[in-house]
């Protein structure tokens, strides 16, 4: 397991524990469960991803810790509509406030303006955050193996499935992949090509880890997909699912940036 102390991820996780304590004081788990029950029906995230080739999770992100403001003109509703028209399979919506300038309400805003399912992109540290994701109308959650123990991964994925949420489990290396594979095969697997310590991106990370999986297991490549050549390289290694944010968010028209990178995805 990567040691995340003294990394930006470590700082984020520390902040998330503080945030969790504050949120529990504002609203207990029982109240959040009631909100989750009243949320809009779940849209199948994994199903949508599997039925597009390439299957693209298009990200709605205003800022990042490494780049600062990525998109000053930030309109989640408009971006969601553009992504849907361009052929995205799913959305990824940042809800972290302190590091990514996201907001909880952006999930509902994005979903209300398109028919795509949405991932709550955040750094979840407790089952409370999972139930909260459903209360915010998310269809899928992200579990980052580097941030969580095996027990947390098991408990949080179980909570997600109990609430009809799909689960994307993110790994950075072989050791984390081994841990992720202990979880239900229902979980989607994602490889983040960005080194947590250096922030360098190496697309070969996904290709290397793909070889350790059964051919039937869907794998999502995350971070650093910036050119059609990057996309082709992944497809040549039978990787057809992508999570892309920054490449789209930096451009005036995210839909045009999407088409330039992926062409027109086909339903399969």
Curated annotation (Swiss-Prot):
Q: What is its EC number?
A: 4.1.1.48
Gene Ontology molecular function terms on file = indole-3-glycerol-phosphate synthase activity; phosphoribosylanthranilate isomerase activity
Cite the Pfam families for this sequence: IGPS
Q: Which CDD domains does this one have?
A: IGPS
An example GO biological process term is:
L-tryptophan biosynthetic process
State the InterPro entries in the record. Answer: Aldolase_TIM, Indole-3-glycerol_P_synth, Indole-3-glycerol_P_synth_dom, Indole-3-GlycerolPSynthase_CS, RibuloseP-bd_barrel
- Gene3D superfamilies hit by this protein: Aldolase class I
Keywords in UniProt for this one? Answer: Amino-acid biosynthesis, Aromatic amino acid biosynthesis, Decarboxylase, Lyase, Tryptophan biosynthesis
Catalytic reaction(s) noted: 1-(2-carboxyphenylamino)-1-deoxy-D-ribulose 5-phosphate + H(+) = (1S,2R)-1-C-(indol-3-yl)glycerol 3-phosphate + CO2 + H2O
Q: In which pathway does it act?
A: Amino-acid biosynthesis; L-tryptophan biosynthesis; L-tryptophan from chorismate: step 4/5
- NCBIfam families with a match to the protein in the record: PRK00278.1-6, PRK00278.2-4
Q: Which family does it belong to?
A: Belongs to the TrpC family.
Against PANTHER family, the record matches this protein to: INDOLE-3-GLYCEROL-PHOSPHATE SYNTHASE, TRYPTOPHAN BIOSYNTHESIS PROTEIN
Q: What is this protein called?
A: Indole-3-glycerol phosphate synthase
| Species, as recorded | Acinetobacter baumannii (strain ATCC 17978 / DSM 105126 / CIP 53.77 / LMG 1025 / NCDC KC755 / 5377)
Q: What lineage does the source organism belong to?
A: Bacteria, Pseudomonadati, Pseudomonadota, Gammaproteobacteria, Moraxellales
